């Protein structure tokens, strides 16, 4: 029986998950969990990548103690962040987080003489000020001059483990520098941010074998033999691989710190309508494109829970929210003001105060406001998706931590008038492992993999509740339209 390890690292935590196929079902077990987060250092919010590497090896030591002598391993992380590596093969500094404020106004500055339409036609990627393109635009020029290689976060971790450097395609696409037509980094855009093609390791597809963990690590840690596979290294790309894909015309919602809502396409959709709606065409595994919208997601809920002293579990907060009447206020949950405020509760309350709406005060009111407005935002985006694609999405597959929030799943189903399939909650780790299984020939292809996922995990299904909330979605859409007009 083969053993697979998914190293799945998010903005606030990471874990090592053990995957094995037993009696025709995929089993998943958490082996090791650790904290992650950025901290202010030398004037910027930075990641401690040395901590991440140490925790990966601590997890692998636990794997060996389980009696497992050799494993496959894949690494996925969040997107857009990178590590600058010098000619000596070591990082030049701790990498800066995408939530750092250095890229404020970077889009406006870079596009002052380079039209947005031109960039979108080339890359198909939505405009977000933390994209790698704008981070590099704001990067220290002296530091870039010393840089031998620019490595995306999961590629850097794989490089440290094996000594082999590559740039995996799904994460590379999120940089907003990968040319859709030629499948290479775009020279014009690279020139705009003073970097060269040679500074990026070679591009590889998901499922490429990277190599074995270097011998030196075996002298420092008591770990099994490990072969590293370059999986779909962007965590959302792995989550989409780990989506059951139920329905004839299905969409996915990867619901975690960020919410990524979209569908899987065989050809990119980078026309003017997609551009104006700020949809993105991120590259997926096995020749696909993830046509999606990036939404603030459960970050807002995570911040509020923390500001409440972490005294409630998310389950308890969902129960409290269930007791509160929904839609007492409309909130554009994707507003940039919620990206990294000093106090999220105050920011939500100020927003409601400024828009002359009911102010949420109690934990239940705050979480009802968050969940109901996320559901409204999802339903609104599903309507847009239908219009752009020219057909109706019939099923929404919700994966990730948000798939456990029954209140939000049911609201989304009702508001969007769509069937919702929730689960697996660990879709990112599942997708990470599935790519490894396909590479090792234990699973034939992505279709067979998704059938295995559907029969291996307990999925919950939600159907719309007829006429329950009247025209609330139209009222929300009018609110967003009026808000946009006020900002012009």
Swiss-Prot record:
InterPro entries from the UniProt entry: ATPase_NBD, FGGY_C, FGGY_Carb_Kinase, FGGY_N, Rhamnulokinase
Matches recorded under SUPFAM superfamilies: Actin-like ATPase domain
Residue positions of the active site: 235
Name of the protein in its database record: Rhamnulokinase
UniProt keyword annotation of Lipid biosynthesis present: no
CDD domains: ASKHA_NBD_FGGY_RhaB-like
Reaction it catalyzes: L-rhamnulose + ATP = L-rhamnulose 1-phosphate + ADP + H(+)
Pathway(s): Carbohydrate degradation; L-rhamnose degradation; glycerone phosphate from L-rhamnose: step 2/3
Residues reported in the UniProt entry to bind ATP: 11-15, 257, 302, 401
Stated role: Involved in the catabolism of L-rhamnose (6-deoxy-L-mannose). Catalyzes the transfer of the gamma-phosphate group from ATP to the 1-hydroxyl group of L-rhamnulose to yield L-rhamnulose 1-phosphate.
Listed HAMAP family: Rhamnulokinase
Gene Ontology process terms (BP): rhamnose catabolic process
Cofactor(s) listed in the protein's UniProt record: Mg(2+)
Domain of life: Bacteria
GO molecular function: ATP binding; rhamnulokinase activity
Family membership noted in the UniProt record: Belongs to the rhamnulokinase family.
PANTHER family found in the cross-reference section: SUGAR KINASE (PTHR43095)
Binding site for substrate: 79, 234-236, 294
Gene name, Swiss-Prot/TrEMBL: rhaB
EC number: 2.7.1.5
Keywords, ordered alphabetically: ATP-binding, Kinase, Magnesium, Nucleotide-binding, Rhamnose metabolism, Transferase
Highest classification ranks of the organism: Bacteria, Bacillati, Bacillota, Bacilli, Lactobacillales
